[in-house]
């Protein structure tokens, strides 16, 4: 019986695998790439590394400097990316900014000087715009300089009061022309009312005299007198409304017809 030599014969007749040619740009491993990472173009630090993510082009690989914590691209310009560089690190950067400005030793010199200036300024140095405007108005008004002392002018309450008084004085001056016309009209109306009251008193007296002589006269004569008196009232009312004009002045009611 022949020995079993199938396994050996299979190994002898096995064909060798062909060797594949790998391009040179694929031969560089990640370790070799990390070793050959160039120095940082900003701080010249050799503490740099190759970025495995966010590399959009193999011809221009992206690197990161651990010293200044900035990214740059080989063959390109230096990118001014803040610490972390990603949107996921934004909350951390905000917290760092709050912590950084929470103490004076971590703040810039300009901010420290500004804060010190604001704190060192006395409270009385603040400018009150309302008081300045009131003082400006009082300086322009003619009535604001009367009956004032040095202590009253310094107080903001006094200056505000004078400003309101000057404003009301200007408004009254502007409306004097219109108020003059209305004043003359009111005077004329008042005179007309007084004349009407006087005329009504005379009519009442005439009627009382007629009723006194009622016992001496007949009913027919009394009726004629009453009819004549009432018929003359419209004419008298029209005549009492007539006015005499002498130049530009209005005279009172002409009551010569009534024996005044």
Curated annotation (Swiss-Prot):
Q: What's the main place this protein lives?
A: nucleus
Q: Which UniProt keywords apply?
A: DNA-binding, Metal-binding, Nucleus, Transcription, Transcription regulation, Zinc, Zinc-finger
InterPro entries assigned to the protein according to its UniProt record, in alphabetical order: Dof, Znf_Dof
Q: Which Pfam families match?
A: Zn_ribbon_Dof (PF02701)
- Which parts of the sequence are Dof-type zinc fingers? 38-92
UniProt feature, compositional bias: Basic residues: 87-101
GO biological-process terms attached to the record: regulation of DNA-templated transcription
Where are the residues of the annotated region Disordered? Answer: 83-124
GO MF terms listed in the record are: DNA binding; DNA-binding transcription factor activity; zinc ion binding
Q: Domain of life here? A: Eukaryota
Which subcellular locations apply to this protein? Nucleus
Q: Where does Zn(2+) bind?
A: 40, 43, 65, 68
Read off the PROSITE patterns from this record.
Answer: ZF_DOF_1, ZF_DOF_2
- Establish whether keyword Metal-binding is in the entry: yes
Per the record, what is one GO cellular component?
nucleus
Task: Describe its function.
Answer: Transcription factor that binds specifically to a 5'-AA[AG]G-3' consensus core sequence.
Which protein is depicted?
Dof zinc finger protein DOF1.2
Which organism's genome codes for this protein?
Arabidopsis thaliana (Mouse-ear cress)
Which gene underlies this protein?
Answer: DOF1.2
């Amino acid at each position: 019986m022949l020995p079993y030599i199938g396994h050996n014969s299979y190994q002898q007749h096995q064909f060798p695998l062909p060797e594949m040619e790998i391009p040179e740009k694929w031969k560089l491993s990640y370790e070799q790439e990390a070793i050959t990472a160039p120095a940082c173009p900003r701080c010249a630090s050799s503490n740099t590394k190759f970025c495995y993510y966010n590399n959009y082009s193999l011809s221009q690989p992206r690197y990161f400097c651990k010293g200044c914590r900035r990214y740059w691209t080989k063959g390109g310009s230096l990118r001014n990316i803040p610490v972390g560089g990603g949107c996921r690190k934004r909350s951390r950067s905000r917290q760092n900014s709050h912590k950084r400005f929470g103490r004076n030793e971590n703040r810039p010199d300009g901010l420290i000087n500004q804060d010190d200036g604001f704190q060192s300024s006395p409270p009385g140095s603040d400018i009150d715009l309302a008081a300045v405007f009131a003082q400006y108005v009082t300086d322009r008004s003619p009535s604001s300089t009367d009956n004032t002392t040095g202590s009253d002018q310094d107080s903001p309450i006094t200056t505000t009061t004078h400003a309101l008084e000057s404003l009301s004085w200007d408004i009254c001056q502007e409306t004097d022309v219109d108020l003059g016309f209305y004043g003359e009209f009111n005077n004329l109306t008042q005179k007309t009312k007084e004349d009407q009251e006087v005329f009504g008193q005379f009519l009442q007296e005439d009627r009382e005299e007629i009723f006194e002589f009622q016992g001496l006269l007949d009913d027919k004569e009394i009726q004629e007198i009453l009819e004549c008196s009432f018929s003359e009232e419209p004419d008298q009312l029209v005549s009492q409304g007539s006015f005499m004009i002498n130049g530009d002045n209005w005279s009172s009611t002409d009551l010569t017809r009534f024996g005044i």
